[in-house]
Amino acid sequence: MEVKAMEIFKKYLSLNIPKKILITYFLCWAGFLFSFSVGKFLLYLSSILKSNFISEPAKLAQSVGTAKFNAVSSAVSNTVGVKNAYLTYALSYIVSNFMGCLIIMFALGALAYLYKKDLEKAKTLEEKEELFKCYQKYLLILFIFTVINPLTGLIGVNLQYSDLIAVLPHGFFEFFGFATAVVVGVELSNKILPIVKREITSKKIVILIACSFIFIFIAGMLEPIDWFIYSYAKAYGIPLLAAFATGYKNLFLYLISMLFKS
């Protein structure tokens, strides 16, 4: 099983960057839905068993996520002003999520760097081979962990499946941002300590980081709009799909009219 998984991972590493990003993008969505579903199942199990073994961790995860967002939001509001709620929320989202992207890149790259240092200190061939096997294994585990992102399942555990419509517009760009960040991290690790023979220039890495930021930026600008539409639809009993279709149609028409005016 482990050998087969490593073979698949090596094939993934051998792919070109666009294919890697596309595969990682769909894996991020699959990981999100998986962790969300597991969270919902555990919450259901918790209610049957009259236990807090999932609701309490979910509350903790939500409080950690909220505290992180509030810390960023406070810093942003001091710059843009607390009266501009939309911009404060959007910029807080952008900064918070792009920080997450940078952490993903750093974590994957750092793993390769640390194992490279250990390999340089290794004295025997057997020791080097064992270290390299461990490096490949833990890089795969870290890759899977970043893609599945189990914390998401706990944070969103109180949402219904039908509520996920609210995630789709900004999530489309957000997961492209995260997928690009994961690919950057994987490329960095393979550049530092190669598993497969691939060449990537520093310029390409910088471009990919910029692309990740652009995707997160677009998602950040859409996210407050998505949750406003969601809250409005819930408050007035409007079907979510109809609310989002109408909301984005009007937004699109407004932007088109603004372009023609300019």
From Swiss-Prot:
It is a multi-pass membrane protein. GO terms for cellular component: plasma membrane. Its main location: membrane. Signal peptide: none annotated. Disulfide bonds: none annotated. Coiled coil: none annotated. The chain crosses the membrane at residues 21-41, 94-114, 139-159, 164-184, 205-225, 240-260. This is Uncharacterized protein MJ0096. It comes from Methanocaldococcus jannaschii (strain ATCC 43067 / DSM 2661 / JAL-1 / JCM 10045 / NBRC 100440) (Methanococcus jannaschii). The lineage of its organism: Archaea, Methanobacteriati, Methanobacteriota, Methanomada group, Methanococci.
